[in-house]
């Protein structure tokens, strides 16, 4: 029978005393270790504050919980989630993901009628957040070419000053493969 769980496996090495503490706490509460871990991770990320990657409505929103921002961009569509994260910049998503998103958002080839951020999963209404940019893309095309764009961005980073255009890169790639 197929495993229908949408959960993913997380593997990490931790100090032996933390593992023992986790096991003892789970036993004492009659809970599964995985549930306690999920709660600890979510609470830990909730406690981390970041510079708000959106336009804040109020001055007190200049710093927000990481999970508030993450929840605003989350999608089970991995490409959309990564595009949203990268569109918020390198401080939020790291350099490579930001470069991929910047390339896609700035290339007419990927333009379309899909609003990348939409209502930010309700955060526009709840918090008054607005993204700094409102990219509109052809999402099926972005989904199809996302891995190629990731390769292209890595290629450009590793082969400076050589900078072929995206179409030239795709042609080089198809001839090599």
Question: How does the language model describe each region?
Answer:
Residues 19-21, 25-56:
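Short, basic amphipathic alpha-helical segments that act as recognition/interaction helices
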Residues 6-7, 48, 102, 114:
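Residue-level marker of intrinsically disordered, low-complexity segments enriched
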Residues 1-19, 23-31:
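Short Lys/Arg-rich basic patches
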Residues 53-177:
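Charged, low-complexity intrinsically disordered terminal regions and linker tails
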């Amino acid at each position: 029978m197929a495993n229908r769980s949408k959960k993913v496996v997380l593997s990490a090495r931790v100090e032996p005393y933390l593992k023992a503490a986790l096991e003892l706490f789970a036993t004492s509460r009659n809970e599964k270790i995985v549930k306690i871990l999920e709660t600890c991770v979510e609470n830990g990320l909730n406690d981390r504050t970041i510079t708000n990657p959106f336009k804040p409505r109020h001055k007190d929103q200049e710093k927000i919980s990481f999970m508030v921002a993450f929840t605003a961009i989350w999608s089970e569509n991995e490409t959309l989630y990564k595009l949203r994260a990268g569109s918020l910049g390198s401080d939020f998503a790291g350099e490579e993901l930001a470069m991929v998103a910047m390339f896609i958002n700035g290339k007419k080839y990927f333009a379309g009628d899909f609003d990348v951020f939409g209502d930010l999963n309700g955060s526009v209404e709840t918090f008054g957040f607005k993204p700094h940019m409102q990219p509109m893309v052809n999402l099926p095309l972005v989904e199809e070419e996302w891995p190629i764009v990731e390769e292209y961005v890595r290629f450009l980073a590793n082969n400076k000053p050589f900078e072929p255009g995206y179409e030239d890169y795709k042609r080089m790639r198809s001839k090599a493969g």
